[in-house]
Amino acid sequence: QFKISADRYIKEKSSIAVIGLSVHTAPVDMREKLAVAEELWPRAISELTSLNHIEEAAVLSTCNRMEIYVVALSWNRGIREVVDWMSKKSGIPASELREHLFMLRDSGATRHLFEVSAGLDSLVLGEGQILAQVKQVVRNGQNSGGLGKNIDRMFKDAITAGKRARCETNISAGAVSVSSAAVELAMMKLPKSECLSARMLLIGAGKMGKLVVKHLIAKGCKKVVVVNRSVERVDAIREEMKDIEIVYRPLTEMYEAAADADVVFTSTASESLLFTKEHAEALPPISLAMGGVRLFVDISVPRNVGACLSQVEHARVYNVDDLKEVVEANKEDRVRKAMEAQAIITQELKRFEAWRDSLETVPTIKKLRSYADRIRASELDKCLQKIGEDNLNKKTRRSIEELSTGIVNKLLHGPLQHLRCDGSDSRTLDETLDNMHALNRMFNLDTEKAVLEQKIKAKVEKTQS
């Protein structure tokens, strides 16, 4: 039955695919249902690779995107299994999910990841945080042993592309982050004359929260209240940023702190809402000098502030999707910078595809070496028997063994050179594959079916156990 299954896939090379949604394709209320906390990435990878047609997997989940990268033994079946997994996880029907998902294959999927890493697909062009998040996928995968060789190499090459794009072009010059865009949005909504006197509250002292404080300083703010579960992170921010007064308040005093704030920034990992309509209605009114409206700027995914707060007369809520208003400025300059970075991405893409193409011949190389070594060992044994063990000392025996190994290596050198397709010479992939198929026929290696049979057999046995 495994040979029948292998025959079905023999003409279809395994595909690299990305299935996901981002700030460009789906609203935040859908993205938050699919968000996977970083500590749960290994579990998600384990669940994905247990699917029948998924061989490798990685998860990239941020406030602006949720993307799953896989190596699928079958494109159609693999995609269907991943979409069903996403539907089951989020509770969103697969038919509804498909309206917002994007799906890219092979070079399209790889180029997309490289563009993501370079900050070209970000809401904020060239922002640096996404590169750190791509790096974290690799670190997480290495610690948990969850990444396969294709996905691991693709993400590492994406990091290289992201670094080169920032170093060799001016794409990150003047680039803002989600945190700085949030501060900019708040300043746009406040009365201009009152920006510096507005009472600022930050809930959450993580990486993005720290950046909020940094950009408030850049805007000239002199004081910010920070609510956090523990005081240690707030102390660390206070130690680093001397140009602003930072007042710590524990999580138990969050609503009291909000009552004394004109602008509330939220940036926590909480999976439940911190502020609902009822909370906003219970807060005291804001002075008319401040516009009479309390601003909630929520850069968390899942969201910390309910959208229903905007139904409250004296409250307005903005989430990550609303930051587009800030970053749409200088659109022409953004396009020009992106074009400069695309040339670098194309170079890195060619290198990765050459490496992946070269993997097709690896099973043939292993089979040919094994075949040659079996013949060498058999003939060596016959030779040693004819000579007789009594007539051989250790040095002579070792010399004969080295001679046989050397002859085999010399004979294999030419054929193996013609199985290389790593971009180091002018040989095309088609030429290399023709050589591979010729060797398969000449030596009856039958490599492709053997490899596919092993993969399918392992998958079937895993699901049946």
Curated annotation (Swiss-Prot):
Binding site for substrate: 62-65, 122, 127-129, 133
Biological processes, Gene Ontology terms: chlorophyll biosynthetic process; protoporphyrinogen IX biosynthetic process
Active-site residues, record numbering mapped to chain: 63 (nucleophile)
GO MF term list: glutamyl-tRNA reductase activity; NADP binding
Catalytic activity: (S)-4-amino-5-oxopentanoate + tRNA(Glu) + NADP(+) = L-glutamyl-tRNA(Glu) + NADPH + H(+)
Recorded GO CC terms: chloroplast
Pathway linked to the protein: Porphyrin-containing compound metabolism; protoporphyrin-IX biosynthesis; 5-aminolevulinate from L-glutamyl-tRNA(Glu): step 1/2
InterPro entries cross-referenced by the UniProt entry: 4pyrrol_synth_GluRdtase (IPR000343), 4pyrrol_synth_GluRdtase_dimer (IPR015896), 4pyrrol_synth_GluRdtase_N (IPR015895), GluRdtase_CS (IPR018214), GluRdtase_dimer_dom_sf (IPR036453), GluRdtase_N_sf (IPR036343), NAD(P)-bd_dom_sf (IPR036291), Shikm_DH/Glu-tRNA_Rdtase (IPR006151)
Matches recorded under Pfam families: GlutR_dimer (PF00745), GlutR_N (PF05201), Shikimate_DH (PF01488)
Primary location class: plastid
Keywords noted in UniProt: Chlorophyll biosynthesis, Chloroplast, NADP, Oxidoreductase, Plastid, Porphyrin biosynthesis
UniProt signal peptide: none
Binding sites annotated in the UniProt record for NADP(+): 204-209
Annotated positions for site Important for activity: 112
Keyword Cell membrane in annotation: no
Family stated for the protein in its record: Belongs to the glutamyl-tRNA reductase family.
Function: Catalyzes the NADPH-dependent reduction of glutamyl-tRNA(Glu) to glutamate 1-semialdehyde (GSA).
General remark: During catalysis, the active site Cys acts as a nucleophile attacking the alpha-carbonyl group of tRNA-bound glutamate with the formation of a thioester intermediate between enzyme and glutamate, and the concomitant release of tRNA(Glu). The thioester intermediate is finally reduced by direct hydride transfer from NADPH, to form the product GSA.
Full protein name: Glutamyl-tRNA reductase 2
Annotated organism of origin: Hordeum vulgare (Barley)
Gene name of the record: HEMA2
